[in-house]
């Protein structure tokens, strides 16, 4: 009998699928919609301590091969997501991750201090976003390894519970090595989500001769099919370099086969962003069916049988 069930982080997940932070998770209605879907888990919108409107529109555009966005962290503010986690979420349905993306170390520390008692009581899991590429004047923390170390030190100290980190994509072997070495200094970091959008792409419409989003002169994070190979590389790089941590795959998942590739590269959970935005929450049922079909064809009964088993050419 084939099974997509997982036991991770002291939680049971019916399957490895969840949304990516930012998609279908900003409002209470969104979060209830994700809870009602067949996903194995959900994560809330990356939040800041105060509500944010984000960047001016248009700030998201989808194409056949993916999407570009420069949302700028629009969110309802930490108090809303904390209240959802403490009072509103039905944990009997599926586990909840809460994503925070404070614009300073101090802001993150203040939020995780307040989250800790709720996490202890309810079991909500923290995903610390160190990789938003779309806040003007705020560079991605995880591209500055000393800053990343400081954030992880301070959050580990203030939170005192297991948590995960949402990473940007890296493109250099030396950066994989350094980033993994920093992560490995922190035993409370139990999972690493690879990857956030590929920052600062530029999409131009040939007809109008114009960029397609307004913020940052049209520069924005790329998602979707454009980034699948980059996401797989990052998943596999951190899977190999962080043997004591889980890796969550994110980027370019439109089909069960895409998810299969993420798991083959080393992913435990698989997050869906652009394709969920475009197709809606019904996508999770389709992804589960397609993944089970591939497993049946290949004779795999559990995800563990092929996780991280990608073959290299000798």
UniProtKB/Swiss-Prot annotation:
GO terms for molecular function: dihydroorotate dehydrogenase (fumarate) activity. It is found in: Cytoplasm. Optimum temperature is 37 degrees Celsius. It comes from the Eukaryota. GO terms for biological process: 'de novo' pyrimidine nucleobase biosynthetic process; 'de novo' UMP biosynthetic process. Its EC number is 1.3.98.1. PANTHER family: DIHYDROOROTATE DEHYDROGENASE (FUMARATE) (PTHR48109:SF1), DIHYDROOROTATE DEHYDROGENASE (QUINONE), MITOCHONDRIAL-RELATED (PTHR48109). Belongs to the dihydroorotate dehydrogenase family. Type 1 subfamily. This is Dihydroorotate dehydrogenase (fumarate). It comes from Trypanosoma cruzi (strain CL Brener). The gene is pyr4.
